[in-house]
């Protein structure tokens, strides 16, 4: 069940409030399986059927914009859902992204196609997506939260949201808050 059942005229409903399922293949890549396409506030979908009776690893992407009140996953009566057997994506030392609606996944056709999710699959590394639609304004409280993450790299993409004045006032302090706790970790700035 979706929280708001929002519809955006510039983005697909699958991207806004749908689900994407990926499967880990023997060639060590995540492969798209199917999407749950929303039809309203309450939805029911069969994403995959007629599966071979063997264990596989799956990754489910949640909606990019609309939240979920609840999510129930049904499986065949003989099937089980267990903890992953593989550590993919690798959760240790994630990539942390901070930025705009574009970073959040704005206008991606489906959840798995948000660029941070594509990067996560390609690198097999967890990506923490702190994309705030219209609100990447270099709030120093956000920098403090970001600095608490033991990341492999920080990617800062705030230019489309922050004004020149906000950047002059806050950018260096925002950077220094993160840098003070992570003196040797790369911090990448994305320009407009």
Describe the function of each predicted region.
Residues 1-94:
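N-terminal secretory targeting modules
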